[in-house]
């Protein structure tokens, strides 16, 4: 899931080397903390949050077999 998120985000942003994903996992959930360059935050969020909502949907679908709750957070 971490790799999936990184690949999707790197294809959306203009400064790819600033993409960083940190994975925190416990018994019931997985938290993926995403950080990008400040210039690219708008591209990740999208108009009315459509892009980040789509990213979260794809990551959750990819994690379906883990039976864990997946959260994607954008860090500033």
Where are these regions (language model features)?
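RNA-contacting regions in translation and RNA-metabolism proteins
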Residues: 1-43, 57-76
